[in-house]
């Protein structure tokens, strides 16, 4: 149910100055997963060129519940989806102060089968009027962005017979032409579903047995083909942790979804399939979590498990098939999608904390331009005891791009600034964010020169302006 604030966060003195300032002309929203253009890039300027020893000015900090989803910001509102006790909570705050505007809570019994936290994984999607969220158990919500009142709700797990996913629902919804596109992961042919964004009614559903049965298992040894097993939902789980991508290729609009089995292109209006491409690890208990990188007619897929590596695909004229451009182990990305800048990918590669590396890779060729070890020392796991100092590495960091700089958050809360440079690593500064602790798996969010960071306990706001 929706409820008003006040739930006051700790507000620092910097807030007093901030409140007196009008929103600058360079103000920009970050209304959904991967930002305003869905590519981790912001058009904002006037950002700091380095990080001072004491860090940028703290604007506010706010205690929140469990979850891995990033907050979203639109029209002065920040929305964070988190879990406290046995409730998932969608909470809207004033982006400048952190003060709660409204909350909507609903029951959740989700327990992660692998021992990770039980909070939501998907980032809220904000429009001018509405807030869309997808919870860990597959509850799809549309709320009024002003009041927090429920507009409609769907229980995707029940409505579409979804097998239990490895880590809960983790593919953020996107909006395309009035349709909310969701990777539901259902049997038999409801891996991807389009909902009417205004009403929540199902418009189309596709992807499953008819997509994959009989197709070549590209990248696997021998000449194997897919034999879809209706009786083994464990093997035929469809949901991955990649968010759908909407792109125009050769003049045709595509919804590109990397499911657990591989890449599928769908017509956004009808859900009809254009092409599919098998891409997954040979081990059962694995998923693909990196959202594809799309540029022109090229699509990059990557997976960190068991030498699956990466493949760059080119969509052929007509939009009905693809061909491989390169394939290799240059990138084995877990979930932190690379940033593409001037033909170069800036990426954190590696499955676990000890084998994390920061790399610059040429998008078109796969050539590695530079590489730096960012793994946790001594092969240790990243979970730290209370008071223990975090290692001075980024691990599997998450990056965004703004004002000609990469803003990186490491998975134990190390904040870094880098200048994109294919010739060498050009680090502008680093600082350990005091509130952030492992696991910091939500990417940074930038709106109106304010940087929003989230871990399992806090959302913090820092002034990143010059």
Residue ranges, per PLM feature:
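Sec-dependent signal peptide recognition
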Residues: 10-17
